[in-house]
Amino acid sequence: MQELRLVLILVGALAIAALLFHGLWTSRKETSSKFGKKVDIDFDSDVDDEQAAPMRGFDQPKEDVVVQKERKEPAFAREEVPTSDDPLFEGTVSSESNKFTEQEKPTVQQAQPQPVVQQVQEPAVGRIEPEAKPVAAPVKREEPTISFSAIDDEVLTQPEPIQAKVDIPETSTYLEPEIIIAEPEPEPEQDVIVINVHGMGSDRFSGNRLFNSLEQNGLVFGDMAIYHRHSDLSGAGKVLFSVANMVSPGHFQVPEGEEFSTPGISFFLPLPCYGDAEHNFKLMLQTAQMVSSELGGNVLDEKRDMLTPNKIDEYKQRVKVFCRK
């Protein structure tokens, strides 16, 4: 195995060496064919027909390569002279053309260029790349650079246009808060339960006797010159029901005493009332019956008819319905 490996290594090395040699040889051959051509320096045959520029050939040197550049001067072309049958005209033209040729020859010989010799060192490795042709560098036009930050600053710093302020009366687009006027709550429906006490026939209730009966049943003379039943028997509490004179204006003339008389009195319970309405109605009915019994009178309804049990039930029902509202 080791011998086979050595053989392969040697074969590979030889192949690599052959490739390198072939590459060097090919590059030298290309270089010789490129720089070994003859450069002809030819001058215009019209200027000097007899003299011709020598043709020089340069062999490929081993190290330095001489490149002969051709510099071509402008040639003066000979104008063709129109021929004519007139002999005088031919002589003039030929003489002028000869003078021009004689003056032209020394000028062209003085302007004969010298060959320019340029040494080109052969690169050490590989092929020789062709000489780069001079390329005219593009002319750079310096354009003004625009700084966007400066523009932004300029825009920001530009003074705002002055606008004339005109006070325009504002329209009533502002919705003023609605003023909620608390409407007065509707007064609760009021009702009055009336019970009358009337004397027998044409009898009348005398003043002192009537006043004593009312006071003994818990009634107190007070506002509006009438009697009231209070929640407190001392007369300091709320009014539960009241008693008025049946004769208008309804006042009692207590100071007159015996001189005062009336055909009857009226008990009335206003609804709503303080406390329990049903209890207040029962208390008013009992008081009316007690006073009627003491004075010898009759208990009547609001229409001054006899108070019957059915009418009492109707009063109670009215009180219950009102309390439910």
From Swiss-Prot:
Residues 27-325 are cytoplasmic. Pfam families: ZipA_C. One of its GO terms (cellular component) is plasma membrane. Its main location: membrane. Signal peptide: none annotated. Belongs to the ZipA family. Interacts with FtsZ via their C-terminal domains. This is Cell division protein ZipA. The gene is zipA.
